[in-house]
Amino acid sequence: MMSDPNNAPQDHDSGIVLASASPRRSQLLAGVGIAFDVVPSDAPEESVPEETPQQHAIRLSLLKAREVANRPEVKGRWFIGSDTIVVRDATILGKPRDARDAADMLGSLSGRSHCVISGYAVLDRITGKEVADAVTTVVRFRKLTDEEIQGYIATGEPFGKAGAYAIQGIGACMIPAIEGSYTNVVGLPLCEVVETLERLGAVRLFASDRPLCAHLDPPA
């Protein structure tokens, strides 16, 4: 359960917290000028039988946000959780265990389209309100030769990435087209997350008087 807002210290009443260690998610938020703290979640990433990929991504996003929000020592009001998965033929592709696993994943994606699904959750610690959803992007890979696959693996980029590639890196050279959100493939559906933060009163991205973060005073 979420911490009782009435028992939260006063200095917990403002601020955004990203419950993720992903540098890519941090870069996306920072790139639009949002101020936030990073507190990686320790929530277990376990699968549930008969769960759809979308349900899986949303559930894990909520778990991550809730786990960090429930830590009494963590300061902040709005908590962002996210989980990104790559799905090919209804099979979820995680992060490659080793070079052979990466080669198998890339070979299975070669010359085909697949889906990248990012779940996201934004939790307001004070009101207890939670907003969560998932965004799907279709990614098309060009046909890759075995030499290209091995060369890409040698760069080290596939490791630590769901599906064994990074669209924001060298992997972009393998992807002629996508249908949907680019930032979703990077790891965070930025448009939807920022819109949710605005609805919950955490940011004012397009306010003429900015500041970006609602809890900060406007410039004199």
From Swiss-Prot:
Pfam families (alphabetical): Maf
Keyword Hydrolase listed: yes
Cofactor(s) the protein needs: a divalent metal cation
Principal place of residence: cytoplasm
Top-level taxonomic group: Bacteria
SUPFAM superfamilies hit by this protein: ITPase-like (SSF52972)
One of the protein's GO biological processes: nucleotide metabolic process
Sorted UniProt keywords: Cytoplasm, Hydrolase, Nucleotide metabolism
Site annotation Important for substrate specificity: residues: 24, 84, 168
Subcellular localization(s) per the UniProt record: Cytoplasm
An annotated GO cellular component: cytoplasm
Catalytic activity entry: dTTP + H2O = dTMP + diphosphate + H(+); UTP + H2O = UMP + diphosphate + H(+)
InterPro entries: ITPase-like_fam, Maf-like
Positions of the catalytic residues: 83
Cited PANTHER family: BIFUNCTIONAL DTTP/UTP PYROPHOSPHATASE/METHYLTRANSFERASE PROTEIN-RELATED, BIFUNCTIONAL DTTP_UTP PYROPHOSPHATASE_METHYLTRANSFERASE PROTEIN-RELATED
Family, as annotated: Belongs to the Maf family. YhdE subfamily.
NCBIfam families: maf
Main function: Nucleoside triphosphate pyrophosphatase that hydrolyzes dTTP and UTP. May have a dual role in cell division arrest and in preventing the incorporation of modified nucleotides into cellular nucleic acids.
Protein name per Swiss-Prot or TrEMBL: dTTP/UTP pyrophosphatase
